[in-house]
Curated annotation (Swiss-Prot):
Catalyzes the attachment of proline to tRNA(Pro) in a two-step reaction: proline is first activated by ATP to form Pro-AMP and then transferred to the acceptor end of tRNA(Pro). As ProRS can inadvertently accommodate and process non-cognate amino acids such as alanine and cysteine, to avoid such errors it has two additional distinct editing activities against alanine. One activity is designated as 'pretransfer' editing and involves the tRNA(Pro)-independent hydrolysis of activated Ala-AMP. The gene is proS. Consists of three domains: the N-terminal catalytic domain, the editing domain and the C-terminal anticodon-binding domain. It holds the Pfam family tRNA-synt_2b. This is Proline--tRNA ligase. It comes from Prochlorococcus marinus (strain SARG / CCMP1375 / SS120). The lineage of its organism: Bacteria, Bacillati, Cyanobacteriota, Cyanophyceae, Synechococcales. Belongs to the class-II aminoacyl-tRNA synthetase family. ProS type 1 subfamily. It is an enzyme of class 6 (ligase). PANTHER family: MITOCHONDRIAL RIBOSOME PROTEIN L39/PROLYL-TRNA LIGASE FAMILY MEMBER (PTHR42753), PROLINE--TRNA LIGASE (PTHR42753:SF2).
Amino acid sequence: MRVSRLMLVTLRDVPAEAEIVSHQLLIRGGFIKRVTSGIYAYMPLMWKVIKKITSIVQEELDSKGCLETLLPQLHPAELWKESGRWDGYTAGEGIMFHLSDRQGRELGLGPTHEEVITKIANEFLQSYKQLPVNLYQIQTKFRDEIRPRFGLMRSREFIMKDAYSFHADETNLKETYLEMNDAYEKIFKRCGLETVAVDADSGAIGGAESREFMVTAEAGEDLILLSPDKKYAANQEKAISKFADPIFLDKKEPCIIQTNGQRTIKELCDNQGFHPSQILKVIILLAVLEKNDLQPILVSIRGDQELNEVKLINAVSKYLKKSVISIKTITKEQLDSQKLLDIPLGFVGPDLKDSYLNKAANWNKKFIRFTDITASNLDSFICGANTIDQHRAFVNWSKVGGLPEIVDIRNAMPGDISIHDPKQKLIAKRGIEVGHIFQLGRKYSSCLQASFTNEMGLEEPFWMGCYGIGISRLAQASVEQNYDQSGIIWPLGIAPFEVIVIVANMKDDLQRELGEKLYSQLKDEGVDVLIDDRKERAGVKFKDADLIGIPWKIISGRDSATGIVELVERSTGISKSLKAEEAIKELLEEISNYKKSILQESL
């Protein structure tokens, strides 16, 4: 390929809308073009990267016996209603684009394909003799993001690989889960990425167990917690840890203390001299359920701990046996709108009576009450007195109506003790999720009535797994992990081109002829090579080559009359002056050795 034919347009200035480095570099390098909020065109260079990632994914999945297919992007609403996910994905802040056709039938643009593939499997897979089967596709998906940002990291249209496996028993599901874990590790190594596999929450997909693959980068939206010995790693949404003991509070006679205007933990500690771990923080929240059912929740947690919203959603969902769309913190304005003027926000105790909800316009009239494990073992604590400007001191659970249901709803934090070794303190890193694997169990097969005939001749639901890789996100995540002040540094395995031949001066016949010769020889050797044959200044060509991140440069310049070229490695900046033949030989060896090492690491 010739740069003169590439439609390459690069920018020197940082685009105003690009917040993180990878987004900036992809726009500046002409890899992507924003069409509208959260929607991007993949330009020729980016499409080459996408195709190389896709090829790696296909090779590794095919080697595991997976079968490639292509599923429809438009899904009938009936399937999603049957699984119970339609309302959660379309109502309020739901992420599914949905529409009605000319006959008035509801359809959704698929963000994921569990419902569709399960129905298809039910028709094609009749017997245990046909199992296991693992089907995958690579195609465009859609999410109606509330706030699209960071380029391809959180877009409304994206390319994804999703796979779905069907099994006769749980043991076989777990075996496939481990096989897919192995395939993912190989895929990411071949893509030149450093990833961390972490325990994760299954979210709206559901299932018993799941694992995320994170590219560690400062721009990552997720916080991951790891032990230094690498034996524990989890997304903070899922992470558990051993928490520090509270500061002991004397067991004195319970009393009421005046705390005028002291609504927060900090205000209470600053004015009364308490430690946050001695205070019971009581929070009123609202769970938004399907069909806009609104359920108040009263949560008690130790004052030095943070509430984990994902864990709380899971706890509420398990308690009610219903899907929870979202959790909202209650504000004074919301209380006013419900005509609940008597609830003393900032001074609430764990024994706040349900009768406070009697006047609620459209909330359920009874609290769900949870206590985090950190608060459950407090023998003496401070808490709100359910009266404005008053707290209770030196009380225990028997004095405040008894202990509510105990659940783990706290955030594990950096510095906490790891659960597997008291010598290991958790450290934090930011991560970009590029892959996620799930053990779905029988969640979808049961609700969609998808079954097979087992060895005993009886019908039973499939055991299922699902496995996703964000192809377009992975491409940008690679940039976030591989760049310098000059531009992108693509790993060789997914670079749009492996080598760029730069003719410094196209007006110089010797430089041009040597450059063309190098280009032809490299093409003949099977190298993915680009030649910069533009009539531009050499400095412009060098800057563009660094910006777009081609791993190797061969420069035909001033010494071309003697057959000398410059060989430059993008990642290190190391430059060598060599005879053209020697440069090609060394380059071929470097490319071959790199590919061998990557393949060896992934074995």
